[in-house]
């Protein structure tokens, strides 16, 4: 497990999104070259969608073999299919509809008007089963080997739909949970848990804007994961925080090299 996070601070959110998109393209191409395919977990929110839009606008996107890419989600708002607030709907608009993905490899979380109806626990269990089916049986794993897992960091330090002091952030067994009573609407969601997040080779946390500065400082200053879920998001090989200058404004400059600014 990568316990020491790496920080990269960019001038503004636009540059951060472009740089993150370039990093992701390189990571996907490298994974496809070495293993034949790549697996990425997407995040929603303004920074996650900004990265996808930057990727869509990048000429280098054509280096990716989109037919050999598995896409998963870290969390989802439990709303009807096609609802504009669903992360998958926003991802399709930002990028997915513009690239030749294999539909069988786009693993959206269930919607509230799907086969499980409004039973969010059944929806979470179904997604956990889908993850398990895609896992390598020889590794006795319950989730696939994610090359990169993307997470946005909320102003309250939440990641995915794991909120401070809520039951979900305390989960230690299940890979996917139904979330009830989210402090951020809508109240019902599906989310990966910290144990699932920590199986990823690399976890990238995205934060931009002055409203994220306190959360970033809290998560990187030794806060516990129950109080600051972002502090508990770590990759097996690498944990990378991609920030803009505003989000990094409460960090001591000794935490990141001047060249990264």
Predicted regions and their residues:
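N-terminal glycine-/serine-/threonine-rich phosphate-binding loop
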Residues: 1-40, 121
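A glycine- and small-aliphatic-rich helix-loop capping segment at beta-alpha/alpha-beta transitions
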Residues: 54-65, 89, 164-173
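Glycine-rich N-terminal segment of FAD-binding domains in flavoprotein oxidoreductases
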Residues: 29-59
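Glycine-rich beta-strand-to-loop/alpha-helix junction loops that act as flexible
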Residues: 42-47, 151-155, 208
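Class I SAM-dependent methyltransferase SAM-binding "motif I" and its flanking Rossmann-like core
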Residues: 148-195
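ATP/nucleoside-binding phosphotransfer catalytic cores, i.e., glycine-rich phosphate-binding loops
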Residues: 195, 201-261
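Ligand-binding beta-strand-loop-alpha-helix segment within the catalytic cores
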Residues: 2-4, 64-147
């Amino acid at each position: 497990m990568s316990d020491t996070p790496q920080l990269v601070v960019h001038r503004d959110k636009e540059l951060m999104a472009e740089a993150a998109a370039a990093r992701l393209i390189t990571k996907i191409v490298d994974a496809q070259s070495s293993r034949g395919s790549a697996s990425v977990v997407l995040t929603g929110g303004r920074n996650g969608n900004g990265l996808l839009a930057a990727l869509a606008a990048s000429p280098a996107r054509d280096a990716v073999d989109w037919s050999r890419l598995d896409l998963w989600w870290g969390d989802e708002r439990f709303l009807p299919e096609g609802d504009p607030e669903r992360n998958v709907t926003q991802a399709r608009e930002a990028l997915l509809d513009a690239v030749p993905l294999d539909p069988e490899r786009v693993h959206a979380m269930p919607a509230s008007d799907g086969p499980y109806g409004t039973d969010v626990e059944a929806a979470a269990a179904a997604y956990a089963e889908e993850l398990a089916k895609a896992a390598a049986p020889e590794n006795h794993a319950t989730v696939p080997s994610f090359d990169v897992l993307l997470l946005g960091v909320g102003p309250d330090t939440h990641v995915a739909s794991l909120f401070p002091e809520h039951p979900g952030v305390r989960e230690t067994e299940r890979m996917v949970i139904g979330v009830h009573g989210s402090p951020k609407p809508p109240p019902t969601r599906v989310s990966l848990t910290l144990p699932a997040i920590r199986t990823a080779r690399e976890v990238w946390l995205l934060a931009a804007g002055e409203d994220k500065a306190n959360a970033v400082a809290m998560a990187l200053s030794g806060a516990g994961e129950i109080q600051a879920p972002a502090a508990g998001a770590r990759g097996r090989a690498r944990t990378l925080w991609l920030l803009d200058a505003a989000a990094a404004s409460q960090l001591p400059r000794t935490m990141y090299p001047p060249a990264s600014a």
